[in-house]
């Protein structure tokens, strides 16, 4: 019972987010299409974490490479968990409003974005948005229904890239090592006639230090408002790439429509099954529900996904990979809209037991589908 209480408490204060969709010039490219996403929405807090480039425990990916014309308006969509909201009227979708901070976009040139590794890459920044007239980039993303928009520089040279989108939540950043980094990578191909191959290159990990003034910072003024005390906010990392003529640091949102359904390009002859790791169910879903391979696993009431694992194994993997470090950082909401106090709960004794407990529950029982 104690283990159940600990896991329930951790889940109840999870106000995190996952980048999981891309739009190009207003066209939604599809859920998890070309995006390498983890099951877990937990952040990385160690700037020297070996998986700081594209996140850890990546389980959801396909071979899609998204074509992005140089100069295009690009959108990155964030959701509280895979599929979006954790339930109806989820107050923390796409992320808790208290998680103020900047959003940045980096590119790394690769030979084949579909299967490129993330170690040893050289990254250059193409867009950033921080604090502007009291409004944070995260505020704009929430107002846009989870979409963060930026303009891909028109001078970027064509080719395959990994596109790293990073959200930095600063609500607890007054403590060293407590700033929360959320990042995922998309697989893209830049098209056009640009010739700029990047500048101000950095490595991940290695680009940031824990005591950078944009990472170790109290963003609250004396009245508890997240204004950074009226001071300019310094975004970590290098300056973004600029082309002649400049760029728009705060692009306005544009309507996003769904991409046309691609035609089948082969398969097992039936052609009706959803692809591995594709959506196969959920409230309001109208696509295929049969499985070409794998098992349709309910992530929540609104989203089911094809997994090569059994229901039990899939949920065990989700649970165990959600926080590889046994002590779990739990933020307690003590004030209106802000999280001022953090607790560390040691779940080492109960981690495996509770994962088994939750994994054997059917998905229609509360707690059975994490």
Curated annotation (Swiss-Prot):
UniProt catalytic activity: [(1->4)-beta-D-glucosyl]n+m + reduced acceptor + O2 = 4-dehydro-beta-D-glucosyl-[(1->4)-beta-D-glucosyl]n-1 + [(1->4)-beta-D-glucosyl]m + acceptor + H2O
Subcellular location: Secreted
N-terminal signal peptide: 1-15
Superkingdom of the organism of origin: Eukaryota
Cofactor(s) listed: Cu(2+)
Family listed: Belongs to the polysaccharide monooxygenase AA9 family.
GO molecular function: cellulose binding; metal ion binding; monooxygenase activity
One Gene Ontology term from the biological process aspect of the record: cellulose catabolic process
UniProt free text on domains: Has a modular structure: an endo-beta-1,4-glucanase catalytic module at the N-terminus, a linker rich in serines and threonines, and a C-terminal carbohydrate-binding module (CBM). The CBM domain is essential for binding to and subsequent oxidative degradation of polysaccharide substrate.
EC number: 1.14.99.56
SMART domains: fCBD
Lineage of origin: Eukaryota, Fungi, Dikarya, Ascomycota, Pezizomycotina
InterPro entries on file: AA9 (IPR049892), AA9_LPMO (IPR005103), CBD_sf (IPR035971), Cellulose-bd_dom_fun (IPR000254)
Binding site for O2: 171, 180
PROSITE patterns, sorted: CBM1_2
UniProt cross-references to PANTHER family, sorted A to Z: ENDOGLUCANASE II, PUTATIVE (AFU_ORTHOLOGUE AFUA_1G12560)-RELATED
GO CC aspect terms: extracellular region
Pfam families assigned to the protein according to its UniProt record, in alphabetical order: AA9, CBM_1
Keyword Transferase: no
Stated name of the protein: AA9 family lytic polysaccharide monooxygenase H
Biotechnology: Lignocellulose is the most abundant polymeric composite on Earth and is a recalcitrant but promising renewable substrate for industrial biotechnology applications. Together with cellobiose dehydrogenases (CDHs) an enzymatic system capable of oxidative cellulose cleavage is formed, which increases the efficiency of cellulases and put LPMOs at focus of biofuel research. Glucose dehydrogenase and aryl-alcohol quinone oxidoreductases are also catalytically efficient electron donors for LPMO9E and can replace CDHs.
Cofactor note: Binds 1 copper ion per subunit.
Record key words, sorted: Carbohydrate metabolism, Cellulose degradation, Copper, Disulfide bond, Glycoprotein, Metal-binding, Monooxygenase, Oxidoreductase, Polysaccharide degradation, Secreted, Signal
Species this chain originates from: Podospora anserina (strain S / ATCC MYA-4624 / DSM 980 / FGSC 10383)
Region named Disordered: 228-272
Control of this protein's activity: Glucose dehydrogenase and aryl-alcohol quinone oxidoreductases regulate the oxidative degradation of cellulose since they can act as catalytically efficient electron donors for LPMO9E.
Uppermost EC category: oxidoreductase
Disulphide bonds in the chain: 155-243
């Amino acid at each position: 019972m104690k283990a159940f209480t600990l896991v329930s408490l951790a889940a109840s204060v999870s106000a995190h987010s996952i980048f999981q969709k891309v739009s190009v010039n207003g066209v939604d490219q599809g859920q998890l299409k070309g995006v390498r996403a983890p099951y877990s929405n937990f952040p990385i807090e160690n700037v020297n974490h070996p998986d700081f480039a594209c996140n850890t425990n990546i389980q959801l990916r396909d071979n899609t490479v998204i074509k992005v014309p140089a100069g295009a308006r690009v959108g990155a969509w964030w959701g509280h968990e895979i599929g979006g909201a954790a339930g109806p009227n989820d107050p923390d979708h796409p992320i808790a409003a208290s998680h103020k901070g900047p959003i940045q976009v980096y590119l790394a040139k690769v030979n084949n974005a579909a299967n490129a590794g993330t170690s040893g890459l050289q990254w250059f920044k193409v867009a950033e948005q921080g604090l502007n007239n009291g409004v944070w980039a995260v505020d704009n993303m929430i107002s846009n229904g989870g979409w963060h928009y930026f303009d891909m520089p028109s001078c970027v040279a064509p080719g395959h890239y990994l596109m790293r989108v990073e959200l930095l939540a600063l609500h607890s950043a007054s403590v060293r090592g407590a700033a929360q980094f959320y990042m995922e990578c998309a697989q893209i191909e830049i098209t056009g006639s640009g010739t700029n191959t990047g500048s101000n290159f950095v490595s991940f990990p290695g680009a940031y230090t824990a005591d950078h003034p944009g990472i170790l910072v109290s963003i609250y003024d004396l009245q508890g408002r997240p204004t950074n005390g009226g001071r300019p906010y310094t975004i970590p990392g290098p300056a973004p790439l600029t082309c002649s003529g400049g760029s728009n640091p705060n692009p306005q949102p544009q309507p996003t429509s769904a991409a046309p359904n691609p035609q089948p390009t082969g398969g097992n002859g039936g052609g009706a099954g959803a692809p591995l790791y594709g959506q196969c169910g959920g409230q309001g879903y109208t696509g295929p529900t049969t499985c070409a391979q794998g098992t349709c696993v309910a992530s929540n009431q609104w989203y089911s996904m094809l997994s090569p694992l059994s229901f039990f194994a899939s949920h065990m993997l989700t649970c165990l990979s959600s926080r590889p470090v046994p002590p779990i950082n739990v933020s307690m909401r003590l004030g209106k809209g802000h999280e001022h106090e953090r607790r560390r709960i040691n779940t080492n004794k109960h981690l495996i037991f509770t994962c088994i407990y939750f994994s054997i529950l059917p998905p229609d029982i509360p707690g059975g589908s994490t």
